[in-house]
Amino acid sequence: MNFPCIYHVYSIRKIMFLVIVACLPGIFAKYYFFGIGTLIQIFFSIFISLVLEIIILKIRSKNIKNYLQDTSLVLTSVLFGVSIPPLLPWWMTSIGLFFAIVVAKHLYGGIGQNIFNPAMVGYAVLLISFPVYMNNWNERDFSLSFFNDFKKSAYIIFFKNDITTVSSSYLNIIPDAFTTATPLNNFKIKSHLKDDFFLKENIIKNKEVSIQTSWKCINISFFLGGIFLLFTKIICWRIPISFLSSLGMLSIITYFYSKELFMSPQVHFFSGGTMICAFFIATDPVTAACNNVGKIVFGIIIGFLVWIIRNYSDYPDAIAFSVLFANMTVPLVDYYTKSSGYGRNNI
């Protein structure tokens, strides 16, 4: 007999471990294109999260060992660390993690009781507070050895990344904006400055090809990790498929309506955090809808919001805001999509 409430037989600890393993292709791709700063951010995020978690557990008089055994904290840190720019200053990373661990998680009661995705709360706070830094994606310098790349990245992250330096680099829209932006940033820049005679068409095209290739490989890597999660039945197919389907349908319709005003489906699928959202963030079992129909509705809501925010807001990517808005709808979605009791016929 198959019980509807049981989907897999893994322990929580093993589930978290397998999700982290599934992240490895995407993490490696980000390291390859953006340098070792990505790895530094991930390990630093784990360290800061552990410190914050231990402090809060002590304040709440909880058993630290029991709470840390499920390794969910490590997964949150990995997802946060891989989502932020590789050269983000350490103190900004710490601020984001404070909101992720202390505010989004423990103020709601701890693991399993939070209504918002902790990693996305931390990311959204940083994106609103420090938009220049959060769009500063510096391409990797392939001329540097591993050790020199580590030394340079660590120096920038922990000692030299001040607001004056980063802001001044962004005052020169061309070519700096294109060397550090994502394809979603480029679409926004071109839509605002398409009549500016300073925009050299050959510069735009050359930079976009390089940037699009990087983010396409990154998203494909996270997609492969997501397929692994589906194959091992760690996640259900309903949220990723409904999210990607709704985003794809809207982008196809609007792109054919106006290629000047709307992003192409390729840009939507293979830029920013689309694939990590579909398979690793939106599928968070604590903050997503519970039943099967609700999961489909939840995924559709995220896809719709991503399309709206990317096309009509000033924020180039929309993953964090879309997931958090969708998290708010979960009680309503669950209420109106709940099935009748097990063993009863639907009316």
From Swiss-Prot:
**Where are the FMN phosphoryl threonine residues found in this chain?**
T182
Look up keyword Zinc and say if it applies.
no
Residues forming coiled coils:
none
Q: Name its cellular compartments.
A: Cell inner membrane
For this UniProt record, give its keywords in alphabetical order, as a comma-separated list: Cell inner membrane, Cell membrane, Electron transport, Flavoprotein, FMN, Membrane, Phosphoprotein, Translocase, Transmembrane, Transmembrane helix, Transport
What is the protein's membrane topology class? Multi-pass membrane protein
InterPro entries with a match to the protein in the record: NqrB/RnfD (IPR004338), RnfD_bac (IPR011303)
Cofactor or coenzyme needed: FMN
A Gene Ontology cellular-component term: plasma membrane
**What's a GO biological-process term for it?**
transmembrane transport
EC identifiers of the protein:
7.-.-.-
Keyword hit for Translocase: yes
User: Which residue ranges does UniProt annotate as crossing the membrane?
Assistant: 15-35, 36-56, 84-104, 114-134, 217-237, 239-259, 261-281, 289-309, 315-335
- Its primary localisation, in coarse terms, equals membrane
Q: What class of enzyme is it?
A: translocase
Q: How does it assemble?
A: The complex is composed of six subunits: RnfA, RnfB, RnfC, RnfD, RnfE and RnfG.
> What is the recorded function of this protein according to its Swiss-Prot or TrEMBL entry?
Part of a membrane-bound complex that couples electron transfer with translocation of ions across the membrane.
Record-stated family? Belongs to the NqrB/RnfD family.
- Protein name stated in the entry: Ion-translocating oxidoreductase complex subunit D
Naturally occurring in which organism (per UniProt): Buchnera aphidicola subsp. Acyrthosiphon pisum (strain APS) (Acyrthosiphon pisum symbiotic bacterium)
Q: What is the lineage of its organism?
A: Bacteria, Pseudomonadati, Pseudomonadota, Gammaproteobacteria, Enterobacterales
